Regions:
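Short, cationic interaction patches enriched in Lys/Arg with P/S/T/G and frequent prolines
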Residues: 1-46
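Extended, amphipathic, non-transmembrane alpha-helical segments
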Residues: 65-80
Length: 137
């Protein structure tokens, strides 16, 4: 019989590989979570499409509201110019409407930017999820 000698235990090598093994374990755990959450890449793609469709609807609604508020602003500005031409003082009510209108325009623009950012983030998140699920399939 031939007895083969094993290499001696190298603690430095084991310690350097422990980081890699821990990273691989985390990756396997994340993969299992993805599999439980979505099952297949097609399911994840459907979920992504549904979310993006909802974002598009919200963005379209915000844009319609913005157009309406901008039309209101034009009307308020015309009223302001009419008072100015007549040499009358601009009523406080009209000044308040203009200020409130401007705040609404600013808020809606911020909402649109936020929704567009969320849309892009959702696209990138689901792209990585779908790619990972495709490699697992």
């Amino acid at each position: 019989q031939i007895i083969k000698r094993n290499k001696s235990f190298n603690s430095e090598l084991d310690q350097s590989q422990s980081h890699i093994r821990a990273q691989q374990a985390r990756q396997r755990e994340q993969d299992m979570k993805l599999k439980r959450a979505y099952g297949t890449s097609k399911t994840a793609a459907m979920k992504r499409d549904e979310l993006l469709k909802n974002y598009n609807k919200q963005i379209a609604l915000q844009q319609r509201q913005l157009k309406q508020i901008q039309k209101d602003r034009i009307m308020f500005k015309r009223q302001e110019m009419e008072h100015f031409r007549k040499g009358q003082a601009i009523p406080n009510d009209l000044k308040d409407r203009l200020n409130y209108n401007m705040q609404n325009i600013t808020n809606i623009k911020k909402n649109i930017e936020s929704l567009q950012s969320d849309y892009r983030n959702t696209q990138t998140q689901y792209a990585t999820i779908i790619n990972r699920l495709e490699t697992l399939e």
